């Protein structure tokens, strides 16, 4: 701040130095003027000027230091009171601009909230004809057409589900209900949802659960597992998906393993990025690159570590590592 102040008041300092030098120069040229009193006057005035600068530094930088340290939360009450006319101009400008930004942010927040409510209402409304469509598809006798329609229905269902949860994620922490969740029950419910699709593709499930209860939020855990299971089914054919749970180093670990095509090593670091789809095959399958991204976002507030390992041509394993119960309770302040 001192360097900034000196730079700002550089013109003052230069003019004082010039005037002092000019005074000495005039005294030097005029022999009638004794130099000793002139030097004394120059020294004394220089000391007074330095004292003046020190006082002005403390007085002027208080406002700007507070401004520099101001927490950008649009709360102008934390600003130091303006004293000089120029400081008051700055203060008035900040207050005016802050008020404008607060009003704009409020309007934007209200619009987003309205958009979210409208979209959620629309998604809930569309689920009724979607359920009726599923019942109609189940009554079809042509297995080929039934299989094709089931797959397309499942795509619509999962995309709507992703949109529903994507809009809820920003408010997720206000929506958490942490309890003992029966892992087997959640898995059976999600597998049942994918049943028609799995039958079409000849896919079964092998549950090897050493641990059946986890401390988490049931609906958000269901969403994470739904993304992992649908991803496994999508890229597998005529094989089993193995789901294991066990305790490793005091933490519950759940693994979802498929024996599909696997993921290229170069794609693994980006698999959880928003909108990332690895190959052209993904595009023909209608991948949006949102499922795993949303699963990762949901896992973070739940303190679940979501990791992936894969071998091309052999399959993929997604691993969910749950926190220790006491660590989870302490972090969430339960």
Curated annotation (Swiss-Prot):
Catalytic activity, as annotated: ATP + protein L-histidine = ADP + protein N-phospho-L-histidine
Pfam families xrefs: HATPase_c (PF02518)
Membrane topology field: Multi-pass membrane protein
Ranges of residues in domain Histidine kinase: 121-326
UniProt KW keywords: ATP-binding, Cell membrane, Kinase, Membrane, Nucleotide-binding, Phosphoprotein, Transferase, Transmembrane, Transmembrane helix, Two-component regulatory system
GO cellular component: plasma membrane
NAD is among the record's keywords: no
Assigned EC number: 2.7.13.3
Cross-referenced InterPro entries: 2-comp_sensor_kinase (IPR050351), HATPase_C_sf (IPR036890), His_kinase_dom (IPR005467), HisK_dim/P_dom (IPR003661), HisK_dim/P_sf (IPR036097), Sig_transdc_His_kin-like_C (IPR004358)
Membrane-spanning parts: 13-33, 35-55
Chief localisation class: membrane
GO biological process, one term: cellular response to phosphate starvation
GO molecular function: ATP binding; phosphoprotein phosphatase activity; phosphorelay sensor kinase activity
Phosphohistidine PTM positions: 124
Cell location: Cell membrane
Protein name: Sensor protein BceS
Species: Halalkalibacterium halodurans (strain ATCC BAA-125 / DSM 18197 / FERM 7344 / JCM 9153 / C-125)
């Amino acid at each position: 701040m001192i360097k900034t102040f000196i730079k700002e008041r550089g013109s003052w300092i230069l003019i004082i130095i010039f005037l002092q030098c000019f005074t000495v120069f005039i005294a030097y040229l005029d022999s009638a003027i004794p130099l000793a009193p002139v030097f004394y006057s120059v020294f004394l005035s220089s000391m007074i000027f330095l004292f003046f600068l020190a006082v002005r530094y403390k007085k002027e930088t208080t406002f700007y230091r507070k401004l520099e340290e101001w927490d950008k939360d649009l709360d102008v009450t934390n600003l130091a009171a303006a004293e000089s006319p120029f400081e008051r101009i700055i203060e008035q400008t900040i207050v005016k601009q802050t008020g404008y930004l607060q009003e704009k942010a409020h309007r934007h927040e209200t619009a987003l909230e309205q958009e979210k409510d409208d979209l959620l209402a629309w998604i809930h409304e569309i689920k009724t004809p979607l359920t009726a469509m599923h019942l109609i598809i189940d009554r079809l006798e042509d297995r080929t057409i039934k299989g094709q329609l089931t797959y397309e229905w499942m795509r619509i269902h999962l995309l709507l589900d992703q949109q529903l949860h994507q809009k809820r994620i920003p408010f997720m922490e206000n929506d958490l209900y942490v309890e003992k969740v029966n892992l087997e029950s959640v898995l059976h419910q999600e597998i049942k949802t994918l049943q028609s699709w799995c039958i079409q593709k000849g896919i079964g499930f092998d549950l090897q659960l050493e641990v059946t209860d986890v401390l988490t939020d049931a609906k958000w855990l269901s969403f994470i597992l739904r993304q992992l299971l649908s991803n496994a089914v999508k890229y597998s054919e005529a094989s089993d998906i193995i789901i294991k749970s066990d305790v490793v180093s005091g933490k519950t670990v759940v693994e979802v393993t498929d024996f599909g095509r696997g993921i290229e090593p170069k794609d693994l670091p980006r698999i959880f990025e928003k909108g990332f789809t690895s190959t052209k095959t993904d595009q023909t399958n209608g991948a949006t690159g949102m499922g795993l991204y949303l699963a990762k976002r949901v896992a973070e507030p739940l303190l679940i570590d979501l990791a992936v390992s894969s071998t091309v041509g052999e399959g993929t394993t997604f691993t969910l590592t749950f926190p220790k119960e006491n660590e989870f309770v302490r972090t969430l302040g339960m």
